[in-house]
Amino acid sequence: MQKSRILIASALALSASVTVGAYAQDGGFDVSQQIGPDPVLPEPQADLMPDLKVASVVGWKDGETPAVPEGLKATVYAKDLANPRTVHTLPNGDVLVIQSKEPAKSAPTRPKDIIRGWIMSISHGSGSAEQKETNLITLLRDTNRDGQVDERHDLLTKLDSPFGVAWIDNTLYVASASAILAYPYELGQNEITAAPRVLTPLPGGPINHHWTKDLALSPDGKMLYVSVGSNSNAAENGIEAEKGRAAIWQVDRQTGAARVFGSGLRNPNGLTFNPQTGELWTVVNERDELGPNLVPDYMTSVKDGAFYGWPWSYYGNHVDVRVRPPRPDMVEKAIPPDYALSSHVAALGMTFTMDSALPAAYANGAFVGEHGSWNRDSFNGYKVVYVPFENGKPSGKAQDVVTGFLDGENARGRPVGLGIDGTGALLVADDAGNTVWRVASSDGNVIPQPIGTDRVSANPQASADATTAPGSTNEVPGAADQPSPRTDRPSQPAQMQTAPAGDPMPTAAPAQ
């Protein structure tokens, strides 16, 4: 106990000194230079501790809503939630809200880890959310499609830090902190009482530095894709702790057979398929402690077998000299992401807009939820932005769409996961404000029928051919073109049987 007190005291003292010095480091850097396919990357700063500026959560007052541009209207969809992280629309229009908190971990011993834990507790607020039960999935039902929730049911409770979900064939898949679980569930049910089966284990504790596991269903309905964040900032816990991490796994939903699909992604979330191209996309939180203006978080398509740099490099061949031993071979393999969002915005949610009921200005692109910075002296993020697309790729600057989460030095809330509800409006999960916001067209426009988050085509290749970007002559890459999981590895791979990020997975005998 005395040792812990000494560590905490020294850590806080160190953080105070770093905070004072940090105000000279930002230098009025224009973060807009880091938005787009070719971000400005300043020289890294070798800081003992990152800059610290934490927005204390004060919550939303009655009647307050986020700010949106003309042509849009923001309203409360559901409130009094307990750390809502993600939202997911079922084919019948019901919306699932996944609420969770960080799982228990081994006690930190390094001063910087103690500080990080302290910062995270401040940035997520306190009060009613801490007293309410979390780690549950709540169903919200808008029976007459007027944009207001008429029924609310807790579908599952007492889960292990859930985050991502997917639904197909009367089965609800839930990605928890340590496994993908499969629950029998028919649309319209108000509760789930059956026990789940474990589809596949996922890398978990005791460190579990990035614990959120997002989930997406392939357009052909055969595969699940799950994000597994790194176990550290920049491999300071050793590369062995990163086996199977900083990656997106592909999982056969029938057998649980799994393989690493894309790697070198420090903390991927917001998994979603572009409905026009069939490509998998994600948003990624990049590394810290290289200064307030490095490294930009990003959104990117994820290619089968591609390596995106972490931990050895960022944005292609920009080497992180902190990582030992160096791996020039891995740096050479690293490919840059598609689109930078600027440094430390903490992008956690993403959804495409092609089939929404939003105005034409938002008809062909993606929304990104930026949870907000804590490690630079000027706040960055704390908003939802819109990135326009053309021919399957981002084609312009990100535009602020949902703002007002900051109130001076405090935060009313923090956006996380995004989705499109059964009427075609945008939903924003606000884990600090314990609210799901609905952003709709102010003219009341709605889509004719609900479209679920999981878009499954009966004929994936025909669907892909029909949605090929204008001018494209190649077949559209998508889940239908992806190789099936190999059968020479366990159907439920253990964490240590998965290779370090970026290296090929070892061959293993089938599970008995």
Give short role names for the model-derived ranges.
Residues 90-93, 167-169, 217-221, 274-277, ...:
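Residue-level detector of Asp-centered blade-edge/turn motifs that repeat once per structural unit
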Residues 31-32, 448-512:
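Compositionally biased, proline/threonine/alanine/serine-rich low-complexity intrinsically disordered stretches
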Residues 26-69, 106-107, 113, 117-132, ...:
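Beta-propeller domain segments
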Residues 94-96, 171-174, 181, 223-227, ...:
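Conserved beta-propeller blade signature
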Residues 87, 165, 215, 268-271, ...:
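Hydrophobic core register within WD40 beta-propeller blades
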Residues 1-23:
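Gram-negative bacterial Sec-dependent N-terminal signal peptides
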Residues 76-81, 153-160, 199-207, 260-264, ...:
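Surface loop/turn motifs at the tips and blade-to-blade linkers of beta-strand repeat domains
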Residues 148-171, 176-218, 233:
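Asp-box/WD-like beta-propeller blade repeats and closely related beta-sheet repeat scaffolds
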